[in-house]
């Protein structure tokens, strides 16, 4: 199990979103912050990837077909898979009720789409990652 701060842990990210454009933008930002990145276009694929290798952080869209982000998060939080990843719920909705629901469901933080690099850095820092942009950023 991951203990203490994630500031010294290997930084691995899983982006879960049904939009290829959103996954591409998030990947570019995370890679400039020295994350090793994988992505999934749906919840079932994301859960299978987590069973293989649990990332340290998951960017999770909550509006996806077949299995929404809430169900993915519920299954992750009930799973005995080992390390508990930090989960940032991603949304285009500025709905306080939906954001509160995500946080009550076990999300560590939320982030609005479209992604802003500085905001993503701040959110990652809030959940325990020391993020410094690489020189190529």
Segments predicted by a language model, with ranges:
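C-terminal output helix
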Residues: 97, 115-124
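Short hydrophobic/Thr-rich beta-strand motif most characteristic of the beta2 strand and flanking loop
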Residues: 34-41, 49
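Receiver (REC) domain active-site loop signature in two-component systems and cognate sites
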Residues: 64
């Amino acid at each position: 199990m991951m203990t203490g701060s994630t500031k010294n842990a290997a930084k691995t990210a899983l982006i879960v979103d049904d939009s290829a454009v959103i996954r591409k933008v998030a990947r570019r930002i995370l890679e400039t912050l020295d994350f090793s990145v994988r992505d999934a276009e749906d919840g079932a694929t994301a859960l299978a990837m987590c069973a293989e290798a649990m990332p340290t952080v998951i960017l999770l869209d909550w509006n996806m077909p077949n299995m929404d982000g809430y169900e993915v998060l519920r299954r992750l939080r009930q799973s005995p898979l080992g390390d508990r990843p930090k989960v940032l719920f991603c949304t285009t909705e500025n709905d306080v009720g939906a954001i509160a629901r995500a946080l009550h469901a076990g999300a560590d933080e939320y982030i609005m789409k479209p992604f802003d690099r500085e905001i993503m850095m701040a959110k990652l820092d809030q959940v325990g990652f020391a993020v410094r942009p690489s020189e190529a950023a």
